[in-house]
Amino acid sequence: MPCGKQGNLQVPGSKVLPGLGEGCKEMWLRKVIYGGEVWGKSPEPEFPSLVNLCQSWKINNLMSTVHSDEAGMLSYFLFEELMRCDKDSMPDGNLSEEEKLFLSYFPLHKFELEQNIKELNTLADQVDTTHELLTKTSLVASSSGAVSGVMNILGLALAPVTAGGSLMLSATGTGLGAAAAITNIVTNVLENRSNSAARDKASRLGPLTTSHEAFGGINWSEIEAAGFCVNKCVKAIQGIKDLHAYQMAKSNSGFMAMVKNFVAKRHIPFWTARGVQRAFEGTTLAMTNGAWVMGAAGAGFLLMKDMSSFLQSWKHLEDGARTETAEELRALAKKLEQELDRLTQHHRHLPQKASQTCSSSRGRAVRGSRVVKPEGSRSPLPWPVVEHQPRLGPGVALRTPKRTVSAPRMLGHQPAPPAPARKGRQAPGRHRQ
């Protein structure tokens, strides 16, 4: 079908659509409705319902480069064509305008609800998958933090015995703990971002049960985790300084002798004390007994915290690693499924209602066509007719016919009995004696 003459096509109550003639409109509708080529023979219709029309709309990508006003016009034409195609299939019962509109819009509304339910379930699965991956990462980070705590405790325990081994264990454990803390912070940020994005998408599909604000409220657990992260990073930097000091001391044999004397006796000459204190200030070698006890207690507390986090993550993975956001999205999808079932039942009930209305209307029409005569009216049927008897000769009696046609009894009217014959009357054809 060639395209008609280009012109401005205007729909009543809307703006003018420039450059779209009547032939172009028919060509576009055929492209959308029938799914065939624009130029060529029209194939058989493959999209008989509004749902398939919407799917064809998306597949053909005809609206990707169309202005919003033009898209509105084309949408109007599409709906007009749909109403024309579905007019014959609309039930003719005594339905209200609202019920007829419901029957017209139900396929589109059903398609939208099915798409929303599918998208909500997909979002919930994505949130659970992301949460499971981040939980495994947090599990590894917690185990690394626990190993870091063990190494710090061993470094403190070996400080009086070996200076190099103690500093090496302490620095490695502190660095590993800082890396684990940073990993936990990053996983928390990524999980919050994933949940926020999923909730933003779900809020466009339906109302959520709980409100969510990106920067609302104070999350004390995240603040605590950030504090531990900063503390471990500071300790890691200090451990690097301790290792650097140990390497400097190891390169000088005389200085190492003074360090060993300081570690054994806690006493060195006053002219060299300042250099030793400056070299090992804040290290495990320069700790007093009280500081050593406090350091061991802090390392033990961090070790217990990392072990508790590890066990919680492990148990959460065994339970399926489900999040509250995913459960809320699935609850919303379940609610939409219930609404879809209710609308489907109502859609099935309307054609039955229309058919029952049509049958009752036909019954009333048949009953109204019958003529009921009033009481006392005369029957249109003739009275009983006696069979015709030929005139007989003299001396032959008249025979009474065996069969007579009886008149039907009408409502409120009985046929009058025949008059009795007079005694002095003789039968015709007989002569007096």
From Swiss-Prot:
UniProt keyword Transport, yes or no: yes
Predominant place of localization: cytoplasm
Region (Disordered): 346-433
Subcellular location: Cytoplasm
GO cellular component: cytoplasm; extracellular region
Tissues showing expression: Low level of expression; detected in uterus, testis, skeletal muscle and stomach.
Region forming the signal peptide: none
Keywords: Cytoplasm, Lipid transport, Transport
Composition-biased stretches (Low complexity): 359-371
Taxonomic superkingdom: Eukaryota
InterPro entries named among the record's database cross-references: ApoL (IPR008405)
Single biological process term from Gene Ontology: lipoprotein metabolic process
Stated role: May affect the movement of lipids in the cytoplasm or allow the binding of lipids to organelles.
Protein's UniProt name: Apolipoprotein L5
Taxonomic source organism: Homo sapiens
Gene this protein is translated from: APOL5
